[in-house]
Every structure is written in structure tokens, then in C-alpha cells.
């Protein structure tokens, strides 16, 4: 199980863990809300290949949980961001595989935790685990493609937050049949999504080196537009970080990205958000777009002031 509004890294790493369970002859499923996921094209690829029976709605898994059930959480460590709080509360044994910076509100009772903040993605960590498994029962090309998509998402196609281990994982996945061209297709969007993304980028303004864009509620199924627009805003000269806020169900969803000059996780943590240095998000409840904008700007002010103080102290 991954986080709410699961992305390609959450789903890709979950698919990798599912393969490990199968290698060990342990029955397992992936709990995922297919209506809210940002990895819809990946799910469709598995469904079209006849491999979709392992993706189960969270509510449907509750009746099969026993005292011996092991919950493996990927791509998040925060309890409030889990795909299903009910599954977490019902499972007595929990394993966490994550690469995000540890903060308040993390899962505090794991049986085992594999936490590496310097890894590019949860998919990279799962790749390393898979390489210890028997080669004769290893992953399929489709599973390798899912893991490669997770790495490509969190590294922005190997542009940021990559290390030697990242490229080693990608090379191993390529040797297992992952096709980069097919993987790239998972990032394609519809014409409507592209237009919504362009509208958000057009509405942005620059505040203290940060691009801020606000949007009223998007059509159903367009959640993927937020992180894409945030990434697009980083290509503007002089922009160190981007924040895209979109109204949703009486609240506001925020997607933030940076090139490394600002730590967007630190900026969004006071708003209840999480993530890591260059990629973070937050969900504000009972909040208007204007309130969200004010709170984002306040946190940018605080962060920039702290940066200035550190620079003065270093002189």
C-alpha cells in the first residue's frame, strides 16, 4: 500500500514488492484507490495485459486481514497520508520502505523499516531488494517498466536527485526488459489535461524566487495536472521552486517542486505536508485558495529569512 493519490513511484514500488511476495510464495495484493490514483496509465497497462487482479480497493481488503497479515507501506512514512487508515490500524505488523525525510507524524510502530533519504525513489530501493532474489523467478518486463517509471518520475527523467545506485537500478531494470520508450508513454496526458496544465502555468506569478499558481477545482481525473504544472514552472528563469494550489472538495491540494535551492518539504511541513527536498505536497482541509496562498507565502517568507540569516552568519 502506498499513499493517497498514489503516483508512479508508489504504484511501481508496490508492484515490485508484490513480485517479491510471489517469489516467496506468499499471497499478496496491492491496496489502491484506482479512482484517485495519478498512475492511471500504468494501471491500465496491467489491466490490458491481464495482470490487474492484484489491484484491490482498500475497503475490499479489510475482511481478509488477520493477526498474521503483514502490511508493507511504500513511498510514505506518514500515517495521515496512507491510502487507507483502516488497513493500517487493523494490521499488527507493518514494514515501511521509503525515501522521504523523516518528520512528525511518521509510522511509529514498524516491524521493519527500510528508510534511505538519499535514494531517488521508493522504486530504486525496491530494485535493490529484488536483486537479492533468485534470478530464475525474477520480475517480468512489465513489472520492470513500472519500477523504471517510478524512478523516472521522482528524478524527472534522471535530471535531479540521482546517484550511482539510481543508474545501477535503471540498468538492472533495462536488463530485465524495461523499455524506455514504452515507459515514457506512461507520462503522456490527454489534450484536456494539457490545456488545464497550460492554464495553470499561465496564471502563475513569481514571489521571492518562487512560482505560485492557483486554480479553481479541476475536472474529475485531472489530479495528475498539479505535479506536471509544478514541474513546468521550474523551467522559468529565476524560479527556484514552484507551488501549485488547486481547490478540491472544500479544501486545497498543493504540489511543490524545486531544483534544490529551496527545501519544499520544510516549507510545506508546517501546513501538514510532506515529501523531500525537491518534491513535496500538502492537503489543506476547510481552506480557501486565498487562505492557502497566504499560508504558502508566509512559509516562503520564513524560509527565505532563515536562509538570509544563515548566509549572514557564514560571512
Model-derived regions: residue spans:
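A short, flexible low-complexity segment enriched in Lys/Arg and Gly/Pro that occurs
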Residues: 92, 124-141, 245-259, 304-306
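Hydrophobic helix-and-loop "lid/oligomerization" segment in the mid-to-C-terminal part
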Residues: 1-5, 10-52, 62-69, 148, ...
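Short alpha-helices
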Residues: 99-170
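Fold-independent oxyanion-binding glycine-rich loops
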Residues: 3-4, 74-77, 97-100, 129, ...
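Active-site cofactor/cluster-binding pocket
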Residues: 55-109
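Glycine-rich, phosphate-binding/catalytic loops in enzymes
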Residues: 17-18, 88-91, 112-113, 169
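Short acidic-hydrophobic, aromatic-tinged amphipathic segments that line or gate anion-handling sites
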Residues: 51-60, 113-117
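Short acidic, glycine/serine/threonine-rich loops at helix termini
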Residues: 12-13, 41-44, 84-86, 106-109, ...
